[in-house]
Swiss-Prot record:
This is Spermidine/putrescine import ATP-binding protein PotA. It comes from Trichodesmium erythraeum (strain IMS101). It is a peripheral membrane protein. GO terms for molecular function: ABC-type putrescine transporter activity; ATP binding; ATP hydrolysis activity. PANTHER family: SPERMIDINE/PUTRESCINE IMPORT ATP-BINDING PROTEIN POTA (PTHR42781), SPERMIDINE_PUTRESCINE IMPORT ATP-BINDING PROTEIN POTA (PTHR42781:SF4). Belongs to the ABC transporter superfamily. Spermidine/putrescine importer (TC 3.A.1.11.1) family. Part of the ABC transporter complex PotABCD involved in spermidine/putrescine import. Responsible for energy coupling to the transport system. Its EC number is 7.6.2.11. It catalyses: ATP + H2O + polyamine-[polyamine-binding protein]Side 1 = ADP + phosphate + polyamineSide 2 + [polyamine-binding protein]Side 1. It is found in: Cell inner membrane. Residues 19-249 form the ABC transporter domain. Keywords: ATP-binding, Cell inner membrane, Cell membrane, Membrane, Nucleotide-binding, Translocase, Transport. Transmembrane segments: none annotated. ATP binds at residues 51-58.
Amino acid sequence: MTQTALNIGTTLNKTKNDVELRKVFKVFEGHTAVKGVDFNIRQGEFFSILGPSGCGKTTTLRLIAGFETPSAGEIIIRGQSMSQTPAYRRPVNTVFQSYALFNHLSVKDNIAFGLRIKRLGKTETEEKVAQALQLVKMEKFADRYPNQISGGQQQRVALARALVNRPAVLLLDEPLGALDLKLRKQMQMELSNIHKDLGVTFVMVTHDQQEAMSMSDRIAVMHEGRIEQIGSPQEIYECPESPFVADFIGDTNLFQGCVEYNNNSSLVVKTDSGLNISAEYKKVNGKNGEIYGGTSVVLSVRPEKVNLSLYPPDVSENCFEGRLRNVMYMGTHVHYQVNLLSGDQMMVRQPNTERTLPNLDTPMYVYWSKQNCLALSESKS
């Protein structure tokens, strides 16, 4: 289905912003749920707000939708301030995790509901509903009722109902959270394809890192009411700007310590457990930065960047001895847990290339290059 099928998109200009939040706060009975959130969402972008439960992400989405009013700050959609605009007049539609379908209406009547509220003519309504059904591949289920279709099909109907109204921005509140793992992955691909076909701006809230990474153009990582970092999935994963982001996005090995010295190309950190670990100097808080001797830092090393060997490798840096504590066979890859002699535990993830796995308690060596070690300030500047 192309962009013109539902007459949703105009010619996209990804240098323009569809949504702008300007130092937005939200206070509930003395508790500040959103603390000065400030970001732009570009036209036609798939933008995700990612964070743990209670971080303020759903409140932020509800502020954009108009279901909540900011305590301070401003929300702008398509260049217009929404300060005095109620939810029903905003150019947005929302897909909820619960789908909120009308059980007494058929699939096609659920999709047509908003069009009928707008008093569109019968012929135009039927045409738009048919296009929406085709978009989500639900033509054969048009006359069924919500209790006669699966959870994944209900999700498609909710999506079609939101898109048929031609919103400038589609808001998605954990839309795949009620689906099982296999169906969720399938729907991630379908949702991404629909976004690419239509060019509508999607704003999704989720706590699922894999979900956000697989579908988003950019991700805003939220923590305790604040935005920790905004970037592409690759930027967020490879260059986190705080220990929280490094730990929340995927798996990582974290070491706390103090900088012993640096020479403008690398730095050496003495960890709290006594290890001397080399890191690349330019990788400070995910970007070029300055860090000095005596500074407390957190080092992050991704499990897939760590090598594992039964024998001492021919390397001069970041090589440590330990014993194999646990092995988790995952099919395409294997997770190893190694207890270092220092007392630290390390996760190692390697592709499944061996037919046999080492026995538990086997002496092992873990090692990694300084280029794969990221130094992070304990408090994000």
